[in-house]
Amino acid sequence: MLTQVAVAGGLKMYRHVLAFDFDGTLAEQGTVPLALQTALEQLHTSGCALFMVTGRRCAGAQLSSLEDLFAGIVWENGAVLHHIAADEVYLPFGHIGAHLVEALEGAGVPLEHGRATVSTTTPHNETVWQVLNEWGGDATVVHNRGVVRVLPPGAAKGAGLERLLGLCGFSPRNLVSFGDGEDDRSLLQLGETGVAVADAVPSLKEVADVVTTQPGPAGILEALDTYWLKGSPSELPTRRERPIPLGAGAAGTQVSLAAAALVNGNLGVFGDSGSGKSWVTGLLVEGMHHAGYQVLVIDPEGDFKGMRALPGFVALEVNASTIPPPTMVVTLLEAVTVSVVLDLSLFPVARRDDYVAELVDALRPLREHRFRPHWIVLEEAQHFLPPNGNKVSSALLAMLARGGWAFVSYRPDRLVGDVLAKLDHCILTRLRDLEAAQALGQMANQIPEVSLADIPRGHAWLCGQSVARLRPNARRVPHIRHLYKYLDTPLPKHKHFHFRDDRHFLRVEAASLLEFLQCLRTLPIESLAYHQERGDFARWVKSGLGDGILADHLRKLAQRSLRGETLREALVQRVATHYEELHAAR
């Protein structure tokens, strides 16, 4: 939906992790051409992280000084990992068992032995499969240009690189992979963009986003010059499988933002209080995290701490007595798969600016050297970025050129002008204040035939390279203030849950999650079974309480065909645990 921004002059943080197959890709007959060596040195000097991924045995390639350019090397098709800075070698998938090796050799298969794998040549492929079938062991067999490799289960170039990236602190969401052979398929599919050289096998070209016009190392040099090294690099294609859905457009089609647009650019989300801007922001946060991007939400109102319900999302509370230093937040974010909500709702307002300014400074090395977090959301941005500037804006402005920021506010006119000038796109909900609307300038003028003040509740406009009107999707995690409201406070009468069995209504109803839990503990099991078998509980929790997380749990329980008191115990345990988690997070 929105334009992607090219990596130019080292300014953008996206696609700065590059992984190369060796034979046929970097090297020709085992040698890396001098011009390509120079290009790799330039990439390394500019701050890119380089990895080599090869089917060769550990230390089986003559790299000499080139090895110093790589952050890590994946040997033996993913089975052996070398973390160069730590000088550690890992075998994450184990190794081929001795009995299988003996069986292969006993069948007359000539083997080349690695640390974790064995290999032979194509003429022995049928014998290898016969031995595997007779032996009954578990192994992975890969083929590449006349070589047959037998790997431990789970090993592949992509799987090995993913493990090594995590060990080195890098994310696959910053990765571009280069290859030529059959065994490079998982490598190209791991990252954001896959590049195949012109003489790559057809099956690899099918999954590549870019195919060079030159073969082998010349093709790699062509790609590096086109997309990284020249003065005005071309835009590098990114996989289309990572759109972040926002909602239904005017024609009923889905409106999405490309994750690359959020990582490379800066977003403003503006609208009146209660107009839905935090809901839309939450959709994007959930979508980015779900797609594997690391997200940091700076949350002064406590609206996003419910994100802790998502696997891999941590909610960290800052208050007057418990003040985790900014370096602790960065330490949490050093784990590639962890996203963080920083809840400042109980932290004294007068101390927030200093804390957030320190945090932004502390994040700089992680952003510059590991290119993460991919996306940082500053809620209630008007409190931290006033028009006259402050410590936060001073720390922040130098980082905006890299992209990957979102600013959420009901008063964009109260934001420092340098931030507004750096916005690449906006999501706008109803905005009635004239000065706030005027501050958006051309962004607001893109909306046709309607003023910002007249945007209906439940609608939003996406503005930037193109314009789209949408109705936001449902959330994975309900808006936290809505959830808390109905923990103990009664729902409107028409939303109560009315219990019955297969004969009649019981004249018992639940008006809140607490009352629902009490009913589960005391009502006849026949009533609970009646409703659970029909999916009534999950529907009410989703539509009445707006709690999609608990509704999903109840749907999964319904699939287990539980009976009698076992059903009651499972329902009570699930609902009670969820209630306690929400209550503790208030």
Please give the residue ranges for each predicted region:
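Walker B catalytic acidic pair
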Residues: 22, 300, 379-380
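Mg2+-dependent phosphoryl-transfer enzymes with acidic/Ser/Thr/Gly-rich catalytic loops
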Residues: 9, 13-15, 33, 158-240
